[in-house]
From Swiss-Prot:
Protein purpose: Catalytic subunit of cellulose synthase terminal complexes ('rosettes'), required for beta-1,4-glucan microfibril crystallization, a major mechanism of the cell wall formation. Involved in the secondary cell wall formation.
Disruption phenotype: Plants develop a brittle culm (bc) phenotype with a reduction of up to 80 percent of cellulose content in culm.
Family per record: Belongs to the glycosyltransferase 2 family. Plant cellulose synthase subfamily.
Lineage: Eukaryota, Viridiplantae, Streptophyta, Embryophyta, Tracheophyta
This enzyme's EC code(s): 2.4.1.12
Enzyme class: transferase
Originating species: Oryza sativa subsp. indica
The name this protein goes by in its record: Cellulose synthase A catalytic subunit 4 [UDP-forming]
Recorded topology in the membrane: Multi-pass membrane protein
Annotated Gene3D superfamilies: Spore Coat Polysaccharide Biosynthesis Protein SpsA, Chain A
Zn finger residue spans: RING-type: 9-47
Cofactors (names): Mn(2+); Zn(2+)
Biased composition (Basic residues): 138-149
Amino acid sequence: MMESGVPPCAACGDDAHAACRACSYALCKACLDEDAAEGRTTCARCGGEYGAPDPAHGQGAVVEEEVEESHEPVASGVRERVTMASQLSDHQDEGVHARTMSTHARTISSVSGVGSELNDESGKPIWKNRVESWKEKKKEKKASAKKAAAKAQAPPVEEQIMDEKDLTDAYEPLSRIIPISKNKLTPYRAVIIMRLVVLGLFFHYRITNPVYSAFGLWMTSVICEIWFGFSWILDQFPKWCPINRETYVDRLIARYGDGEDSGLAPVDFFVSTVDPLKEPPLITANTVLSILAVDYPVEKISCYVSDDGSAMLTFESLAETAEFARRWVPFCKKYSIEPRAPEFYFSQKIDYLKDKIHPSFVKERRAMKRDYEEYKVRINALVAKAQKTPEEGWIMQDGTPWPGNNPRDHPGMIQVFLGETGARDFDGNELPRLVYVSREKRPGYQHHKKAGAMNALVRVSAVLTNAPYILNLDCDHYVNNSKAVREAMCFMMDPSVGRDVCYVQFPQRFDGIDRSDRYANRNVVFFDVNMKGLDGLQGPVYVGTGCCFYRQALYGYGPPSLPALPKSSVCSWCCCCCPKKKAEKSEKEMHRDSRREDLESAIFNLREIDNYDEYERSMLISQMSFEKSFGLSSVFIESTLMENGGVPESANPSTLIKEAIHVISCGYEEKTEWGKEIGWIYGSVTEDILTGFKMHCRGWRSIYCMPIRPAFKGSAPINLSDRLHQVLRWALGSVEIFLSRHCPLWYGYGGGRLKWLQRLSYINTIVYPFTSLPLIAYCCLPAICLLTGKFIIPTLSNAATIWFLGLFISIIVTSVLELRWSGIGIEDWWRNEQFWVIGGVSAHLFAVFQGILKMIAGLDTNFTVTAKATDDTEFGELYVFKWTTVLIPPTSILVLNLVGVVAGFSDALNSGYESWGPLFGKVFFAMWVIMHLYPFLKGLMGRQNRTPTIVVLWSVLLASVFSLLWVKIDPFIGSSETTTTNSCANFDC
């Protein structure tokens, strides 16, 4: 601050000192230096030079001032002032405002005299003009200095725009729902309602117009048609609200960051394999390599491989894979290649130079391909060596016997290959952790096949890494999209969506399928139509692979935002208007009551102990409660309480390995909730459907994620026999669930958390194998009608014609509109329809009988793992034929209908033209069956168009016997016709 009587700077108004010794004209130091820099050395008031002494007062008029800590004259030489001005100018160029320099207050002595003022031509004093120009220039200087400082501190415009965009993206949703257009969905729903009405009118006509001359045929057809109508309702209405979803991976990165300091959640990958001779180690290795190379922070990825066959071949091939990953992973990340499974990357028939501008790419790619070929040679050598097992068993490289020589009786084995303490890649970077796991097996213990292996991986991973999310893959499903994990995290880590999400399911996509997809291996209708419909309800079903789980959901917990239970429970959605007098307890409440009784008994026993602290008692009871659910492992129990995952920093790695061996022991799950309420659920060979159903019953919802580039791809059995056995396994699992306590028809009503349309979809999932019974009967009806001359419908009236046409038109229009909103092709739809009939009259029928026999007689069905394709020729496996009894029923139906068509035409030729009209309806019916079974017929012919002799003999024999018996018995001839014939025979005409 200035002292009293000292005026401020005449240019800028800041603290000033006397620049002119003659007239004491007040200027601040910055303005004085600015004048000096511009070459103005004369006073604006008196015209004298700055620093010149006043002739009246001499040298003593100015008192020395203190500037910072040194004493210097008020007016220094011009050279010194120019130097200071240039320094200030340099500071301004660097973006530092010159006015930030602080100065001490200066004491100016009073001046006794002031020089005369000089005027310009207009009569205005010159000093005033100069003061005004100073002020204007000062303002300009300040403005430019501020701009320079802002420019120096701010990033470039492009970066600033990107930063602002990232900041905005960080607060935006990570995904969004894209509803189907109303122009597509409204007509679709309207036609469904119309079809339902027409179906009711059709059934009314069919029931009220029996065919008395063929009453048995008519009754059979009506029962079959009613079942088909019921099956259509179960399949159709869960597709009422289909939706699409879109993810924003860039927003995920903006919110949680990337690299070492990323806030992305860790993920544990599970890969399961059993028999390396049927599941080639090279296929499993490609899956593992694609996981290790995913586009995700390496310290947040762990890969666990479950070897349920305890094969040394799997162990050794995994060791080779870990070594090859040191070269493969940095190559993938350096050039951002897709897919990151080397077998499928190098076999692509595309221009691999597209979008690759790095000059060394071609050279490194060629070298990497050579390394991979050498790696394949080593793996194939291991496979060739494993074809013949030594009598003394396998010996490891250190000379000790392989612990898993007996796959049914061996200890648990764990080996960590890569990770934080393991080998690094050739660029010196850390690699994701790779862990080999083979759970303990002993005679007399139930191991629960794949479900038991997955639960063992859940416990091992919880002890070693405890990532909050788990992504499981079959050994033949590789990561096709390196950003697949980020796609899943867009749902899981979105606060507005992920709280109630138990899993994110990706669609299955396949390689190596023939172009026409003869046996509907792609299953496009299910993955692109049904699953989208379920996503609009409570979420898609779990299909066993390509699924990212929330670990806490696998532990049997409900969603965090679970609403309060209703006051009363209902037995079914259809009887909600008839409430019970007393609400039944839900399963969770009954489980809680039983647990409370156990705890009370435990408390009673503890109270008998003298001097037992209450706090210690409560802690012990809590520990006992967790042990009853999760097993006897304090480390694992502690991990279940960590919702965000992670392992305690104080944990000793060697101790954790010992604990991991303990949790995969064969008796660990005894007297616990594993397989009942926790983990993968036991009780069916299709544990995936059962596990997802239990989660949905607890109130969780699931998400269906369909990225533009498929997340995962796998292989499918493309030959007829293997495909039918795969369908047989799925159908048997559904029958097992239908006959168990977890049947959706009666399970899970207590909490009321399963939406009724979602329940319909689960009912359809477990009921569809039983459609094989009416389907086989219906497929035999055309041949029977042609052989007997009867038909299942009477002569059509005008009204009946309208109902039939209305039903056929509604079926066609519904299918067309479904294709329209889903985007699938008509060929995929037709292949699905064909294989629905093929599977229904073969695999589904066997599944029904096997499931019933298993329940009644306790006969367990052992399924072998489907062998993966090994034929080097394109689609070579398509023509491989393997004999199986499943082929007999559809072959018999084919032969029977062909015989019926021939017999029908022969009868029409003998009977005259009046019988041709009814014949066309019967022949059309038979041709409908033959057209649906045509892919099956091609599969029987094989590459050489030859059907195996045994199949031909059995089918012709059955069809011939059936036809002869039918013609001999002729059970559908009316009694009146018989009486007339007998009377005529006794009358002598």
